[in-house]
Regions:
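Chalcogenol-based redox active-site neighborhoods
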Residues: 25-174
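Basic polycationic patches enriched in arginine
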Residues: 2-5, 10
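Intrinsic disorder
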Residues: 3, 16-20
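Cysteine-centered motifs
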Residues: 12-14
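Serine/threonine-rich, low-complexity intrinsically disordered segments
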Residues: 10, 23-24
Length: 174
């Protein structure tokens, strides 16, 4: 990070020049094997995707714990969790938040599924969801809300990029 200062009329104007050195990930498509990962869940226990072999899995990437859209999405999955389980799915939520944040979020909303802490964004990058975003004229790197549906062999069977947070279960079970 480089900091430049321009002093004008006794006002300090600071400009930050940030550069992100992120390797572009391959774009995953339906039929691809889901990248394996190993990271802590909300209890601090290590979760590895390969441990779910033999089960269908929903992996949903979301930007931030306890924010309106992310909470709506998590609560929709919570409210329909038994329906997802009856269809044979395990659910894993992944964001860049830490273990403590995930634990607080899961407890506050009584989320019955696993939340994985991807603080270094390596899982986001492997799945191609760590992207440049724009808000209010400002660009930044962040998680693109995306869901991957996997079969029992760990193969991607669906990718949902236009997530309807309040009706997400219906998108998954379509």
């Amino acid at each position: 990070m480089r900091l430049e200062r321009n002093l004008t009329n006794r006002k300090c104007v600071c400009q930050y020049h940030l550069s992100f050195n992120i390797q572009p990930s391959m774009s995953l498509t339906i039929g691809d094997p889901a990248p394996d990962f190993s990271a802590p869940n909300q209890q601090g226990d290590t979760v590895q995707l390969s441990d779910f072999r033999g089960k269908k899995v929903v992996i949903y990437f979301y930007p931030k714990d306890d924010t309106p859209g992310c909470t709506a999405q998590a609560c929709n999955l919570r409210d329909n969790y038994s329906e997802l389980q009856q269809a044979g799915y395990e659910v894993i939520g992944i964001s860049g938040d830490g273990v403590k944040s995930h634990d607080k979020f899961a407890n506050k909303y009584e989320l019955p599924f696993t939340l994985v802490a991807d603080e270094d964004k390596s899982i986001n990058e492997a799945y191609g969801v760590w992207k440049e975003k724009s808000m209010y004229g400002r660009t930044y790197m962040g998680t693109a809300r995306t869901t991957f549906v996997l079969d029992e062999e760990g193969t991607i069977t669906d990718i949902i990029e236009k997530v309807k947070t309040k009706d997400h279960t219906a998108q998954i079970l379509k």
